[in-house]
Amino acid sequence: MSPSKWLLTYERAVKKATKVKLAAPKYKHVEIILEATTEDPETLENVIQALCERLKEQSWTIVFKTLIVFHVMLKEGAPNTTIVALSQRPRILEVLKASSLLAQGKNIYNYSRFLSERAKQYGRLGVDYAQVGDAPKKKIREMKLENGLLRNVEGIQAQLRRLIKCQFVAEEIDNDIAITAFRLLVGDLLVLFKAVNIGVINVLEHYFEMGHHDAAQSLRIYKTFVNQTEDIINYLSTARSLEFVTKFPVPNIKHAPISLTASLEEYLNDPDFEENRKQYLQNKSGSPVEETAILNRKPTLRKKKSIPKKQNESSSTIQKENTVQQEASSSEEEAVKSLPETQRTTSRIETQEEEIKEEEMEGEEEEEEEEVPNYESENELEDKVGDLSLSLGVASSFVDEMLRERNNLSAEGTSASPSLDKKSESTNIVQPIPSHPNDSLNPFYNSSSPTYHPQPIPPQLQQVQLLSQMAGNQMANIQYTMNGMQQTGASPNTALNISQVNMYAQNNPVNPSTTNPFQNFLRQPSYQGMQFEQQQPTTIPLQPNIPVLNQQYPVMIPAMEDSRGPLPSPAHIMYPEGSPGFIQHSPNGFTHGHSASPVNIGQKLDVPERPMSTPYTASKNPFSTRELAEPTDLARNSISTESKNPFRS
């Protein structure tokens, strides 16, 4: 492609990127302009010249978008290309006619001054500290005082001074152009502030090495840093409040200490400034006074070297003691040789016995040392067993709470829950087992057990537990009785089977069946002062439900009269023996809370047969005001053929 065509594409991209439209420059046009930064300097110069022509327009949108394109070229273009070209003539970025722009005029002016200052400081320092990367920060961190440390820090502060003045008001950031410019400025602010932090720390490290003039300049730099830090914090707080608009996360910044101004001024204004500086340099580099002191410390080193001599002396004394012991032992042997043979043998025997005792003592000590680990292992085993039992106790308590909440049982009426390893320790009480094995709430219940063998129960314990269950578990779905297998009518030597359970078997009158839906409506009698006897169970084959009672049970039937006389009292009704009922006969004649006469078994009553045509004795008309006639009159009127019209005379 010829250069003319290249120029045409770049000029077209510049015009498209800086249109009058109130919108941010499209990246597809900016991308073409960024390609010019990788071309030869002439192409880049032509693009810059075309952008400068757009800065002379009267529309603030065109001018603002042109500055944004310049900023993007400095940030995302080829490094050290656009900044080099602008540093040669930095004033071309300044918008002189910004005051004539009614809208966004102040923001455009400050924005252009910042870009111009950035290009100017690059031409002065040779480093673009606003460029993203670690190279500029590394350079200022390792820079020394004689290499222009103070000058570089002042250049960074000059850029920050111009940037802080670009304070966009929140009401002015109401369009995409201002939002894009503000986002780019916040990014440069964070990069420059990081660079100035590193530079100020480096200045403070060399502060006490400087002369009076450099120290005064460093103090001015530090004061400027303190003031700019406060302004930067306010600027970033505004940016943090506009994160939802700019979509640029603002981090929490850390800066150098800003409370050293007084101490630095005190050091600078000290009349002994030069003496303090020389002393600091001597302490840092090392003075000849210290070298002579180090040479004079040789006797101390000799004293340390004389320590092995003491060790040699101690070793020589030990050798002397050994020689003395050897001489003493040799003298004893000579004395023993001079003794007669009998005394020699006795002395040898004594020495042998002493040696044997010493060996036994040493053996016992070794055994004790070997047994210590065994004791430790036993302690560890006990700890492990204790931990295991604790965990089992926690598990059993959890099961207790689960059963208590599910069955709504009281603490007195429930027994200890089964553990994982041990069975129930009770020998006189049979654990309650539901009539259906699948409905068991016990998680450790073995449903595969073939038989059930109840154990003998003392009558007092049986009745007390029955009463506690009646008081605490009236609405339970499972019959928690002490002799549940026999009360439900199943054989004690057969496995639990639904087909073998008699659902119509007789129950204990003291403990009404918990499956009775009307049991909550029955008033519970007072059991104080009464003695209960053990109930002997009876097994009855499966029979249909016959609503006939074969025991004493309160039946309240109101007295009624018929046309032929009063009806007989229910106390004289004779029920056949052996008929199955819902409540078992109690031998003590216990009544269930009513004052009516009980039903006596064995008494006969002649019940007259009533005709089916007996009229009803009460009128069902709610609007009838006429008094009811006697039953005899009703029967007579039902047979008569007279008219029943009430309006007929």
Swiss-Prot record:
<feature type="region of interest" description="Disordered">
    <location>
        <begin position="409"/>
        <end position="440"/>
    </location>
</feature>
<keyword id="KW-0597">Phosphoprotein</keyword>
<dbReference type="GO" id="GO:0072583">
    <property type="term" value="P:clathrin-dependent endocytosis"/>
</dbReference>
<dbReference type="GO" id="GO:0005545">
    <property type="term" value="F:1-phosphatidylinositol binding"/>
</dbReference>
<feature type="modified residue" description="Phosphoserine">
    <location>
        <position position="287"/>
    </location>
</feature>
<feature type="compositionally biased region" description="Polar residues">
    <location>
        <begin position="635"/>
        <end position="649"/>
    </location>
</feature>
<dbReference type="InterPro" id="IPR013809">
    <property type="entry name" value="ENTH"/>
</dbReference>
<feature type="compositionally biased region" description="Acidic residues">
    <location>
        <begin position="352"/>
        <end position="381"/>
    </location>
</feature>
<feature type="compositionally biased region" description="Polar residues">
    <location>
        <begin position="313"/>
        <end position="326"/>
    </location>
</feature>
<feature type="modified residue" description="Phosphoserine">
    <location>
        <position position="417"/>
    </location>
</feature>
<dbReference type="Pfam" id="PF07651">
    <property type="entry name" value="ANTH"/>
</dbReference>
<keyword id="KW-0963">Cytoplasm</keyword>
<feature type="region of interest" description="Disordered">
    <location>
        <begin position="280"/>
        <end position="382"/>
    </location>
</feature>
<feature type="compositionally biased region" description="Polar residues">
    <location>
        <begin position="340"/>
        <end position="349"/>
    </location>
</feature>
<dbReference type="GO" id="GO:0000149">
    <property type="term" value="F:SNARE binding"/>
</dbReference>
<feature type="region of interest" description="Disordered">
    <location>
        <begin position="590"/>
        <end position="649"/>
    </location>
</feature>
<dbReference type="GO" id="GO:0030136">
    <property type="term" value="C:clathrin-coated vesicle"/>
</dbReference>
<dbReference type="GO" id="GO:0030479">
    <property type="term" value="C:actin cortical patch"/>
</dbReference>
<dbReference type="InterPro" id="IPR014712">
    <property type="entry name" value="ANTH_dom_sf"/>
</dbReference>
<feature type="modified residue" description="Phosphothreonine">
    <location>
        <position position="414"/>
    </location>
</feature>
<protein>
    <recommendedName>
        <fullName>ENTH domain-containing protein C19F8.03c</fullName>
    </recommendedName>
</protein>
<dbReference type="InterPro" id="IPR045192">
    <property type="entry name" value="AP180-like"/>
</dbReference>
<feature type="domain" description="ENTH">
    <location>
        <begin position="2"/>
        <end position="136"/>
    </location>
</feature>
<dbReference type="InterPro" id="IPR008942">
    <property type="entry name" value="ENTH_VHS"/>
</dbReference>
<feature type="compositionally biased region" description="Polar residues">
    <location>
        <begin position="409"/>
        <end position="418"/>
    </location>
</feature>
<feature type="modified residue" description="Phosphoserine">
    <location>
        <position position="285"/>
    </location>
</feature>
<dbReference type="InterPro" id="IPR011417">
    <property type="entry name" value="ANTH_dom"/>
</dbReference>
<dbReference type="GO" id="GO:0005546">
    <property type="term" value="F:phosphatidylinositol-4,5-bisphosphate binding"/>
</dbReference>
<dbReference type="GO" id="GO:0140312">
    <property type="term" value="F:cargo adaptor activity"/>
</dbReference>
<feature type="compositionally biased region" description="Polar residues">
    <location>
        <begin position="614"/>
        <end position="624"/>
    </location>
</feature>
<dbReference type="GO" id="GO:0005905">
    <property type="term" value="C:clathrin-coated pit"/>
</dbReference>
<feature type="compositionally biased region" description="Basic residues">
    <location>
        <begin position="299"/>
        <end position="308"/>
    </location>
</feature>
<dbReference type="GO" id="GO:0006900">
    <property type="term" value="P:vesicle budding from membrane"/>
</dbReference>
<dbReference type="GO" id="GO:0048268">
    <property type="term" value="P:clathrin coat assembly"/>
</dbReference>
<dbReference type="GO" id="GO:0006886">
    <property type="term" value="P:intracellular protein transport"/>
</dbReference>
<dbReference type="GO" id="GO:0005829">
    <property type="term" value="C:cytosol"/>
</dbReference>
<dbReference type="GO" id="GO:0032050">
    <property type="term" value="F:clathrin heavy chain binding"/>
</dbReference>
